[in-house]
Regions:
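Charged, glycine-rich active-site and insertion segments that engage polyanionic ligands
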Residues: 1-84, 95-106, 110-164
Length: 164
């Protein structure tokens, strides 16, 4: 990747991890890389709103507004974003289980550290989080109402990230 595509070593390393050694998948990921910055911002605003929403009815409105914003995007972008979320939760779990060598994501969003988020992703909630994200992706693929699907997912995430 570094020689053929003329990219930086840290980006090549990240893409090599994500593609699991598959060169064709790495090229696809390289082309999608420019789309990821808004994904990071959306992810951070989503999990922050989900944290605040526990026992705070006013913060539920933030989740609904977030859902409406993401629902306004195309279905393919929504699916890519949900895949990105699965990767982020996986990275947080790896950090929580003290395997930093396997963590390849570097957040570019100011004032958000994956290390601080990691303790909220554990063995008690990760399977449910993955299931809910996968179900949401499935329903979006089947032309479900994205606003309803994402609002439901957001409320479930609020419950799941506080699960000990």
């Amino acid at each position: 990747l570094i020689l053929r595509e003329n990219i930086e070593a840290c980006l090549a390393d990240k893409i090599a991890h994500q593609s699991q050694g598959n060169y064709n998948k790495a090229l696809l990921l390289l082309n999608e890389e420019s789309e990821e910055l808004p994904f990071e911002e959306w992810f951070v605003s989503w999990v922050r709103a989900a944290f605040r929403a526990k026992g705070n009815a006013a913060a539920i409105q933030d989740l609904i507004l977030w859902s409406e914003q993401i629902a306004g995007l195309g279905r393919e972008t929504q699916k890519k974003f949900l895949n990105f979320c699965i990767d982020m939760f996986r990275q947080a779990l790896l950090l929580n289980y003290e395997t930093p060598k396997l963590v390849y994501m570097e957040m570019k969003v100011p004032k958000f550290q994956l290390e601080n988020f990691a303790p909220f992703v554990n063995g008690n909630n990760i399977n449910d989080i993955f299931k809910e994200l996968s179900d949401a992706m499935y329903h979006i693929e089947r032309n479900g109402n994205a606003k309803i699907i994402l609002t439901d997912l957001s409320i479930k995430l609020t419950r799941l990230i506080h699960k000990k």
